[in-house]
Regions:
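Nucleotidyltransferase catalytic core that binds NTPs
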Residues: 1-146
Length: 146
């Protein structure tokens, strides 16, 4: 529930975002294909674009039912960090049709992962400017990742 609070802080005031509890209120394991299918049932007619990092796109062939996942998503938005190499031609050989679904999203991205932020907190290193102000304050108030 701590992460739920952090997400709510992160999206507060932005009507374009909403928190879904679909992966919170059901038993594990959670697979992306199941999450997308559940959301499509809850929101019939809606388009679903799955956002992921370039590193996750590289690992997609190892996911649960990756071909079904590709078919089910209307698009896959890939946020690419400078160091991420995206080889769609190689992925297309393993997952036919993926190149038609992937959209590389050019947006400012912080060159740090959530795991690295949690480690900085645990190591008592600065992390303030990696998070929205409300999330930063909540992490401090809740004493998370120490």
């Amino acid at each position: 529930e701590d992460r739920v609070k952090l997400v709510l802080k992160a999206i507060a005031g932005n009507e374009a975002f909403a928190l879904s509890r679909v992966d919170i209120d059901r038993p594990s394991p959670h697979f992306a294909i199941d999450t997308v299918n559940i959301l499509k049932q809850e929101y019939p007619g809606a388009q679903f674009f799955y956002l992921m990092g370039g590193d996750s796109l590289h690992d997609l062939p190892t996911w649960n039912r990756p071909q079904d996942f590709i078919k089910t998503c209307d698009g896959i938005g890939v946020m690419r960090r400078h160091a991420d190499q995206v080889d769609l031609a190689s992925l297309e050989e393993v997952l036919p049709g993926i190149s038609k679904k992937v959209m590389i999203v050019d947006a400012p991205i912080l060159e740090i992962s959530s795991k690295q932020i949690r480690q900085r907190i645990a190591d008592n290193q600065g992390f303030r400017y990696y998070l929205r102000d409300a999330v930063y304050k909540a992490v401090l108030e809740m004493g998370l990742y120490r």
